[in-house]
């Protein structure tokens, strides 16, 4: 049993054999202690966490959100189909592009799409608001999956990946846990 392709003398996926001489060197592995002092870690982790906070709040309260603007349960649940299509499409495209580009543009697009989804959320009474909500949170969710899987290995190396991604995941889980409660409090007051 081997831990990784490198230990068997094999190349990792995504390396073009024709451009082997141009292949980037493997990122130096950093410990969680070092990573916690790196602003790049916090930018990516907090961006992923913020998306989880809002996304979970919307999903948990989808019916009451739509009822607040005079729309019914059927319209509320119909949000999920276009959002899933946008999410799957953006995930496939970003997964393909991630081997060719830096992650910063993907993060930027995720944050812009999140803002568009938020704009759709506050204008949900309009038809365009519905589509902007589905597009924004759908695309953002698809890009969220790419970033949560690639950013830490790419920036901080493989040796402490479990520790680093686990800490980031705990921030995301915490954010997604408080999102629905915070939304309820905001709705009540």
Regions found by a protein language model. Give the residues of each.
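Hydrophobic core of transmembrane alpha-helices in multi-pass small-molecule transporters
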Residues: 49, 129-143
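Flexible cytoplasmic inter-helical loops of multi-pass small-molecule transporters
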Residues: 2-29
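Extracytoplasmic gate region of multi-pass secondary transporters
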Residues: 30-96, 179
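Intracellular juxtamembrane helix-capping segments at the cytosolic ends
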Residues: 143-156
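Helix-to-loop junctions at the C-terminal end of transmembrane segments
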Residues: 90-102, 187-188
